[in-house]
C-alpha cells in the first residue's frame, strides 16, 4: 500500500504558509474532520504494505541519566540487568510464535517534560522516560497475546519489573511502514512515543513528519506501531526506526537542521500532537 499516491483515502491536505494563520484559525477554516495543517515543504513519505507481524513494546524506567547525553559507562547493576534481559530474550525467541526479541538501552533522551505539548498536558501524559526498551516481534498480532501468556514472557517481565520504577507495555500491530528496521546490527535507533488530542490527526500528520525525515536524513526504514484494538495503551502510536550512523553525528545533524526542526515543531503544535523521541542502541 502506497499512501502517498492516493489522497482520496486520506483527509484533505491543506497547504499554507507557516505562521500566516494561527492553528485555531486553520482548524476552523478546514472542512474535513481530520485535515492536517502542514505547509508544502515536504511531501508524504512513501509507504509499503504494513507488516503482518505482531509486536510487544516494553518501555522501562530503570536508571535514566540526568543529562540528555552521556558517554559514561552505565554501571554494574544496569549492565547485569541488560545481560539477564538478553538471555531471557533468547529464550523467548525459542517460542514458535516469536520472530525476534530485541533489547535496547538509551543513547540519548531529551528533557521530555519540557516539550511544548507534553508540558501543557503534563497531568495526563505518561512521560516516556524509558532507558530500557524491549521489542518482541510475533508471527501475527493475535500471537502477541499468546506470547504474553507464556512462562518465558513472564520471566522477562519479572526481571524488568523488579528493576524498574515505571513500566509500560503495548501489544501492537504495524499501521504504516517505510521499510523494516534492521535490528541485527548497531546503529541509532529511535522509539518515538506519540500522544495527541485526536489519534486520527496524529496518524495523518505522521505521513508528513516521516516524509521530512526521509528528505532530510535519508531515512529508509520505519515501522509505526499502534495498539491492538483491546489494548489499554498510554500512547497513540510508537514509531521505530534506525539510522546507520553514530550518535554524535546524528545529534549534530538534528540540532543544526533548522528547517527540519521548524517543520516538525510547527506542525506538532498546529495539530495538538506530542512526540517524545528517545534514541537507543542495541544492548
What spans do the regions from the language model cover?
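Acidic (E/D-rich), amphipathic helical modules within compact regulatory domains
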Residues: 133-161
Amino acid at each position: 500500500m502506497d499512501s502517498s499516491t492516493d489522497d482520496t483515502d486520506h483527509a484533505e491536505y491543506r497547504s499554507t504558509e507557516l505562521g500566516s494563520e494561527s492553528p485555531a484559525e486553520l482548524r476552523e477554516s478546514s472542512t474535513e474532520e481530520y485535515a492536517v495543517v502542514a505547509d508544502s515543504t515536504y511531501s508524504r513519505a512513501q509507504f509499503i504494505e504494513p507488516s503482518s507481524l505482531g509486536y510487544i513494546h516494553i518501555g522501562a524506567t530503570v536508571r535514566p541519566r540526568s543529562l540528555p547525553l552521556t558517554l559514561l559507562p552505565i554501571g554494574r547493576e544496569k549492565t547485569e540487568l541488560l545481560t539477564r534481559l538478553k538471555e531471557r530474550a533468547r529464550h523467548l525467541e525459542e517460542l514458535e510464535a516469536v520472530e525476534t526479541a530485541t533489547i535496547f538501552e538509551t543513547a540519548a533522551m531529551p528533557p521530555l517534560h519540557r516539550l511544548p505539548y507534553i508540558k501543557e498536558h503534563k497531568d495526563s501524559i505518561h512521560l516516556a522516560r524509558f532507558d530500557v526498551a524491549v521489542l518482541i516481534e510475533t508471527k501475527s498480532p493475535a500471537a502477541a497475546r499468546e506470547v504474553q501468556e507464556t512462562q518465558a514472557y513472564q520471566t522477562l517481565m519479572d526481571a524488568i519489573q523488579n528493576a524498574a520504577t515505571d513500566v509500560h507495555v503495548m501489544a501492537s500491530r504495524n499501521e504504516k511502514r517505510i521499510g523494516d528496521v534492521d535490528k541485527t546490527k548497531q546503529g541509532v535507533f529511535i522509539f518515538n512515543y506519540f500522544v495527541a488530542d485526536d489519534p486520527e490527526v496524529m496518524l495523518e500528520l505522521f505521513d508528513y513528519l516521516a516524509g521530512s525525515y526521509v528528505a532530510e536524513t535519508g531515512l529508509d526504514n520505519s515501522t509505526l506501531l499502534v495498539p491492538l484494538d483491546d489494548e489499554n495503551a498510554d500512547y497513540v502510536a510508537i514509531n521505530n526506526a534506525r539510522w546507520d550512523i553514530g550518535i554524535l553525528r546524528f545529534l549534530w545533524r538534528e540540532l543544526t537542521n533548522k528547517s527540519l526542526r521548524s517543520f516538525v515543531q510547527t506542525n506538532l503544535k498546529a495539530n495538538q500532537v506530542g512526540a517524545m523521541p528517545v534514541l537507543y542502541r542495541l544492548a
